[in-house]
């Protein structure tokens, strides 16, 4: 059906939303901060992000700009416990698909995820979205090998990766 990333620092609500959305057939990923969310965005490439407005390491309203810059076809729905109209307006201006109040009893969440998913799929098809150069994150995790030669190669690659020098 599609992939949804939920970013919320309230663990209980995060698990509840994850279960609820997962039961609808979506693959769900969880993060508790903007930083962890960005890592999962790069690794899993979800079509929809459901993000809390207030996170320990940043504002969800501002985080929308970062997400849309790196992943323009990913739709972002912001969750808030505070129905602040000015935050909602700013979120939409920053590129959010929608802005909704938190609560496990909010019957609008699942239909809203479905709408956001449809929109994201449409955007991916229309724009043939690709990652921007800024969105490409490469790591050295997962490289198998502990020999001194491999460790030297990884060390050198890490040093060179911080520069703009072409490497063959």
Features from the language model and the residues they span:
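Acidic catalytic/metal-coordinating carboxylates
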Residues: 32-36, 59-62
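Active-site residues of response regulator receiver
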Residues: 8, 52, 80
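Active-site beta3 strand of CheY-like receiver
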Residues: 44-50, 55, 77
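Short amphipathic alpha-helix used as the core "switch/output" element in two-component signaling
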Residues: 39, 54, 61-72, 90
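Two-component/phosphorelay signaling modules centered on CheY-like receiver
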Residues: 11-29
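AAA+ ATPase active-site-proximal loops
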Residues: 132-168
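The feature encodes the CheY-like receiver
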Residues: 14, 56, 84
